Amino acid sequence: MQPKKSIKCLADMPVMPLTIGTMEWNQTGTWRYLTPTASNKIPPCRSNCPAGMPIPDFINALKAKGDAQALSVVMRQNPLPGLTGRLCYHPCQPKCIRREHDSPIQIQRLERYVSNCDLIESHAIAEKGTGNIAVIGAGPIGLACAYFLGVNGFEVTVMDAGQEAGGALLKVSVEKLDPKVRADEIDRMVAIAGLNLNLGQTDLAASLTIIENSYDIVVVDPTSVGHVQQKPLNPDNFDPLSSTSIVTKKIVVTLPEKLIPFKPGMIAHYIGIGHLTANHISALMKKDPALSCGIIDLSEHVAKDCVRLVDGGPAASAPLKVSREKEWSEEQAMVEAERCLSCGTCNECGQCVQYCPEVSIQIHDGLEFDLFHCKGCGICAYECPRGVIMMEEAKA
């Protein structure tokens, strides 16, 4: 046996062949029969949200960019987060996968914390184009419908007989909802969507014919308060939960029995119905049937066994024994946000990059796969703790 040689510097190295080139020329991707693809899936919390809230997205935005960006993400699907953060029965939380490890994320409290941000412009609004729409009734359905039409570029006027917007929300007790919070939430969404708000229109019932002739579409909100509901515009009633399209330009939104009479705890349902109604109207006005689809595509759910804890993350804290009105501090919100597993949503954790043996993955505003060198081993999909990466058969 030859004695061990101590190598202290480069000069001590024995003579050997050495290449200073790279292996980029060797496109090992031709060996691949499975191809990695990355696409966000629908997590259990979002699939159980009547308003279709992008829950992991807004929590990731809160952690990375702060409450203003998080609120911007929230308001893409929910124009009244301060109300859902206080009134909603939060069906999202019982579905949280984290509950199997310790306790579910307190999503409602995070939403409430984010809603307290002073934000006027939340996201880009489409340029106002053709289409003049009237929404009769400033209840939660009418406001939500008007908001989503407004941010999609339609000119929308909301009319109500009351002196204050809110409709059935005005009847919610002060103990459950501070009137200032309600007013601030409505003012913010009206400003963001560029809505025209005409209140105190006590003669709406008598003016229906004039309104019909002045607007392309007229929507009647069943959650508003006023006499106009008793004198519909003689259209076919429209149920956004079961109808596939709008067949008339004068519609009265109908509600399922479980939402009658108005129930504050079901606020997310009313917002979701307003959103669906706006989608159908957009499809009619833009002659694009694809726009009339639901709020979220329920066919792409994340597989439960694809989501797992990597390092445990922050453990569940003891339930906060605070009054209903007490707000969370930034520290409390961040601690709770860090517990989110981001199920089905890539948060650029870098796990796939770390384990890829071919160094074929990069992160640039999302995942990029170098398919010239990826061999399709599937390690990235196995190691992804969010269930985002899937392996598909390579097409010939």
Ranges and model annotations:
Residues 1-124, 220-375, 379-396:
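Ferredoxin-type iron-sulfur electron-transfer modules and their immediate structural context
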Residues 14, 18-22, 26, 52-63, ...:
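Beta1-alpha1 glycine-rich phosphate/pyrophosphate-binding loop at the start
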Residues 32, 44-45, 132-133, 140, ...:
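Short, contiguous strand/loop micro-motifs
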Residues 69, 127, 132, 183-228:
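Feature captures the FAD/FMN-dependent oxidoreductase FAD-binding
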Residues 117-131, 165-177:
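Accessory recognition modules or surfaces
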Residues 143, 180-184, 205, 350, ...:
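Residue-level marker for well-ordered alpha-helical positions
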Residues 154-156, 218, 252:
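Hydrophobic anchor at the start of a short beta-strand
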Residues 169-171, 209-211, 395:
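Short secondary-structure transition/capping segments
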